[in-house]
């Protein structure tokens, strides 16, 4: 057994070999959107491989509070949509939990609804910047009240008649882009969003699949008001952000081979593969296909020696969520790895630049903060020690990977944070472990 429960936290012991075939849970971004768009659509939407993490369950809970009927059996969800013009004013506060996606996308939809709603979340959500969404929504005509002039949750939004805008986003953020486009569906005229570089495009792909005439070219996407959505069948691919932990583990483990099946291969999300390939990873893409507008494939990973690289610019939005585990890989690569243009990491569930660097240092790695990223000097081994997730699901799982690779293993506090996006993470680790 490689992972032992302790009275406080868990003990992760080093592992020398892995073997097997696994499927990671459904993609978090796509699960959120499938549920939300299903609730906005006319007719039934049937979702398979829905992610059962806490974040996506928060989206379903908010939809129910708004009057949307749905049924779930394990990872299969049926949503009986009646169009979001039939949503009603919630009798209670909408609690998004830890989900920034739920908060920001829901604000976009509610901006065009003729009633008032209040949204809040946990302490992490209440400290994350919302002005990047609330300001353009206010420009479109929504009334939003919140802490520090609507910059932080709790937020109360009074929706109504909206006017389309041409919005140039200061950040490459799929959540910002999606919120404005969703508001644009209920706005007069055309709404256009241009990003500094392209963020993940699940919203654009799925809105088209639900029947919306959405046009996109380069870094710009636009919709016209009045578009109606129709219920669809949505087969959610495995989440490449969840697969990333196993890609790094399979690359750096001394022996073994791992096949990860049905992984989403959206080109706006495959930065982790590009980075690992540049570092020298042995990862093969098999059985490439497309289903429900999203490419997917199987990934076969074998051990390899990695070397340091520089990661910056347009590559960053494609791997922003994978930086914690990529930093673990960099700590065991030959030479130096530098990650820049990633200041967005400072306003995630934690300040991920700070927490990743401090965590790596505590495990014996040579890492330092940059204003917009990290600098990591790789070594032949990682000592191990004590680590804490700080309530951040990506950190929790990155430190498990580090513990499995470290000489002394690690003691980890806060593994329960992984429930947000990967409820069966430790089960899959046990499944592929070979003593």
Swiss-Prot record:
Pathway, per record: Metabolic intermediate biosynthesis; chorismate biosynthesis; chorismate from D-erythrose 4-phosphate and phosphoenolpyruvate: step 6/7
UniProt keyword Transferase present: yes
GO terms of biological process kind: amino acid biosynthetic process; aromatic amino acid family biosynthetic process; chorismate biosynthetic process
GO molecular function, one term: 3-phosphoshikimate 1-carboxyvinyltransferase activity
Keywords recorded for this protein, A-Z: Amino-acid biosynthesis, Aromatic amino acid biosynthesis, Cytoplasm, Transferase
Any coiled-coil regions, as ranges: none
Family annotation (NCBIfam families): aroA (TIGR01356)
Protein name: 3-phosphoshikimate 1-carboxyvinyltransferase
Gene (UniProt): aroA
